[in-house]
Amino acid sequence: MNIRGMKKTIVIALTLMCNSMAFAQKAETIESIVSNSHEPEWYGQQAEAWQKIVDADPKDEWAWRNLLRAADYYVMFNHGYGKSWEEQDKTRPADVIRKMEAAIPDSYVLNLCKCRFSLSADSVAARRGDFARRAVELMPEDACAEDVNYLACRMWITDPDSPLVKELFTRSYRNRYYPARIMHFNRNMLMCMQQDAIYFANGDLDTAPMKMIQEALGERTDVTIINVSFLHADSFMKALYKRLGIKPLDINVQDYGQYGEDWYKHYEADIMMYLIKESKRPAYFSPTNPKTTIIDKDSIYNEGLILKYSPKQYDNFAVAMHNVKEVYDLEYLAEPDLVYDTWHTSGQTDLNHVTLLMNLISKFKKKGDDAQAEHLYNILSKCVERSTIFAEPEGKEAMLKGLKEQLEAKK
């Protein structure tokens, strides 16, 4: 190689090295994967970036908070935690917690992080909610909105009757943590349920926002919200049985070994069916709840944006059409000046409306309600047209074509 070529190679190599170092050193706030997710490698790089900040200032609580979150997500997405406490205690997040205990003992961030990740020695205290309560006691006025929401959920699970549940969810509502579009979706589901219903949620986006509406606004507090993961929490279940006025179910997880790694799905399904039958209350499921196929898919009916359990057949399309005309607020899907928030799940939530409601366009046509069919078509098609989550334009075109076919269906 000649000297000029060698110099060029060295310059390129140094440039790449500097860019790589700059990228690796840039620490960013680690957000919940519900709002903004990344590849595992990104979390690994962020863990290294936050580690440097912690090393420089071991008293920096914000740095510790982000270090634990980055390390936790990296392990979670990369190879998981294994099946035993012994394996979990050997992971990097466990090491972060131990070092945090020495650097910032009994701090707000330490207790917050112990809610998210427990060492085997802390597992009982974590289940009791000890760390959540202590974190709330130490929580600063300017606490991160995401962390306030997380502590509200932890208190709801571990001490459902505590006044802190209402206080924290109200604070989270005022923080405007969840985007308005996700709040709209949850309110639509909440408002269409029958009196004293029980509602089985699946994830963060169809649980906490609905509870927030109940606690902060006082709307539809007659509905009992149950995230399926809460079925494993003793404190939550004890309060739930009391609220529903039924005896606790005598159930043992050891009896579900025959299902292998899917044991928890059948365990949760059996508890849900017990709650439905014993309480004799109307039962609903979020549209993303996979447990409905285990319970009895022939007894699950779509009522628009929500699923209802019914052992008897009924005209669920009539209910869904009523919800669209009289209950749901869908106008926000077609707002002309909409600017999407930064949550990647907001666009997905919008398209859930399209998937769940598009077949009602032809139903309205067949009923002779052309105006409502046209109105629903316009809302849903505008929602699809401006969506930014399609990987390929063909996907958007196919969905728009499907909507058009619904509108042009013969009566």
Across the structure, where does each feature detected by a protein language model lie?
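Phosphate- and divalent-cation-binding pockets in alpha/beta enzyme and binding domains
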Residues: 208-209
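ER/secretory pathway lumenal C-terminal domains and tails of membrane proteins involved
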Residues: 25-195, 215-411
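Short His-Asn-centered micro-motif
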Residues: 200-204, 228-229
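Substrate-binding cleft/loops of secretory-pathway carbohydrate-active enzymes
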Residues: 212
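Residue-level detector of secondary-structure boundary/capping sites
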Residues: 4-5, 180, 201, 352
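Bacterial Sec-dependent N-terminal signal peptides
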Residues: 1-29
